[in-house]
Amino acid sequence: MHAGGKYCGPRHCSFYIIAFLICQLFFLVIFIRNDDASSANELLSFMNESEESDHLDWRVFISHTPETSEDFYQYNIHLSNALGLIRKLPVTRHHSCTTRNSILPAPLEANVSVVISFHNEARSMLLRTIVSLLSRSPEDYLHELILVDDGSQRDVTLLDDLKRWMGGVFGSRYRLGLTFLRNQERMGLIWSRNRGASLASGRYVLFLDSHCEVNEGWLEPLLERLALNTNLAVSPLLDPIDPTTLSYRKGNELLKGGFDWSLHFHWLKRQLTNQESLEMPYQSPAFAGGVLMMSREWFLKLGSFNPYLKIWGGESIELAIKLWLCGGQIEIVPCSRIGHIFRRRHAFDFPPQSDRQLSPAQETYLHNSKIIAESWLDEYKNMFYALRPAARRIPLDHTYDELQRMRKERRCHPFEWYLRHVSPELRMHFDELSATGTLRNEDRCVHARQKDSQPILASCYLSDITQWSMLRQSGQLSTHRELCLAVGFGMRIALEPCGRNETVRRSQRWVRLGTHLLHAESHLCLDNPLKDRLEMSTCRSHAVSQSFQFALEMEGQT
């Protein structure tokens, strides 16, 4: 019926009906397109709309990055600035991950607080970390983002500028809680992460580095695993981002995290069983890098990251040991992928320490590692001291009463349990050796220089003094670079690649006679006739120049 109160004719009615249907179809298409985009993608659209306002333009924000060399950041800062806020990442997870539906608890029972600590990070890299997180995370589960500026000196306005920029972009459009914290002085990653976690209010806490890019569907597989075990800690499989080209590459599902007796992190190879497939979560002795997620309550019950550790280094290893020994587990979840820049060296300085013979970075590492050894390794701490004798003179200014009380209350296992059930590779390495550590002759130690095939005697307190391992079965004397001490033509002592066949091994076989090192093939002994020189000579039972002692002997000497 039209305005005059009369019914329309068939032709007019058809016209109105068709027009009405076209309008409905138009609005339906708009609705579907909007519904397909996540709230974070709507946020990105809002960013583009607001580029007319300089204070909301991300390019203006990035332009305030202090001028400095690429060496400072240890990645390609110019390319990072050119990439913009977000980029399309390759699909690196197994195809079955994209077709299965994760079984998740209700959002209120599984909301996540994300803690990102940074120190002198480039603006574009930090912003890309944040935006990739927001654009690829389900809004209902992402509860809050806590950003901790650990006393950045090069860019002191970064946090305030970021706060204004994000406030202008978000306004009231997003329910995500935002917390901005700044340490007035450098406190370190460990202290900063603990500070963020103490203020978090989500069920779970995710620790994320500030030079990452999260990939599609990264959160749901982690939440699904955590819902099955409240004492579990999970890590995504990290895809490496090349620091020079910023190319995003697929990570390796056949690697797990571990460490050696020097308490350095290492990737360990793993073998798939007949029941396992590449996309299945798998247990790991340690975290793969510093990206991990667990129940906030469980994290706090375990004492958080050890607050006595300084600045950076060892915190993930300490937490991993603590988790496994005190009733927890660690899993790597290959269906969850996060890109991570592994820098070739530290992009920050360590504060000066007390020992002038060590660099600040070396002393900080030894300080933190010594705390881990004294806290958790029990009688196996002697392995650490054998390989890192300089740690003995590092002072520790606290006791372990609180830690021992926690170990007793939680009925934590001894470290022997970890070797048997979690990291048999570490136990195997221990069982393979008859002696290890520095090899000392009086006040000097046998040292293999990087670019020289002939070993010498040098100060035992060199920061890179060679650590030797005497293999129990083969009698080979090996460095960590898998170079073996050998005797060649003319009785010349040299370093050679450790041999696998018996012919090569003969020239590399040594026998312990008391404190002497007898070369099995020549029946001569290692000798030190001059201050820094090594040679082979006839064995003399009481010759001090032929007395060589390992830092740690695992079996009685012949």
Curated annotation (Swiss-Prot):
GO terms for biological process: protein O-linked glycosylation; sexual reproduction. Pathway: Protein modification; protein glycosylation. It comes from the Eukaryota. Coiled coil: none annotated. Residues 109-225 are annotated as: Catalytic subdomain A. During embryonic stages 16-17, very weak expression in the midgut. Disulfide bonds join 97-335, 326-412, 445-460, 484-498, 525-539. Belongs to the glycosyltransferase 2 family. GalNAc-T subfamily. This is Putative polypeptide N-acetylgalactosaminyltransferase 13. It comes from Drosophila melanogaster. The gene is pgant13.
